[in-house]
């Protein structure tokens, strides 16, 4: 934003970038990552395939699933993309042999649906009409996902930080190339169809408002660093104790658990870590 509104010149950006490059060249990826975790800096390594396969974080999270093939070989495959509380995703099975299910498929020529097909009803109502969502996500990945739910008719109230601007508000394009946090094309695209308000969650009064919104909501979405919600007293265990029917999804760079869980970051940093 400082570059866009003229408070800093592009030459200053280039100067700082060169200085950072010189400094980073004296450090290893591991050293930079450890320092970033200690100082809460947005720095992540660009990993190799070997580093991904041997990732301590992915191993801790149980990401790899070992599948035994028909010839007896065992191979690790990427597992489920998320951890579900009550409905875990199905484990991977062995790949079928060529033609293994041909006869079985051919014998099911008159298969009927497991769920009876109802008479088609024409309606202008969107499928998620009536679903109420409290959106505590920020940046791009989370708000883009909840934007899809808004497109399908969900009623969404998005809460932003009252003391720290969402970084996406600083991104181009802007109308007439005039920087304005309320007019970022990317931000408004990600959050179309939602209602919004700003709260300072460090204040008890703001947490009271969040609880009112939780009582209203069917679904809670959040993308803070792990433990942040619990520190505010609004983590899943605390919410579920008062409202056991709540559906909650938490998203962060490295997952909610593990030795690297506290590493913060954006989507481009996830791409770097993924190799």
Model-inferred region functions:
Residues 38-92:
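A glycine-rich dinucleotide-binding beta-alpha-beta segment and adjacent secondary-structure elements
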Residues 15, 85-88, 216-222:
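Short, surface-exposed connector motifs at secondary-structure boundaries
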Residues 1-8, 71-73, 116-118:
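Short, composition-biased local secondary-structure segments
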Residues 30, 68, 93, 97, ...:
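N-terminal helix-loop segment corresponding to the beta1-alpha1 unit
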Residues 10-13, 81-85, 123-126, 188-190:
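A short alpha-helix capping/helix-coil boundary motif
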Residues 17-27, 43-44, 91, 134-137, ...:
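Short, well-ordered beta-strand elements within core beta-sheets of diverse protein domains
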Residues 1-39, 43:
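Aromatic-enriched alpha-helical interface/lid elements that frame and gate functional surfaces
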Residues 7-11, 78, 94-97:
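Active-site loop of classical SDR/Rossmann-like NAD(P)-dependent oxidoreductases
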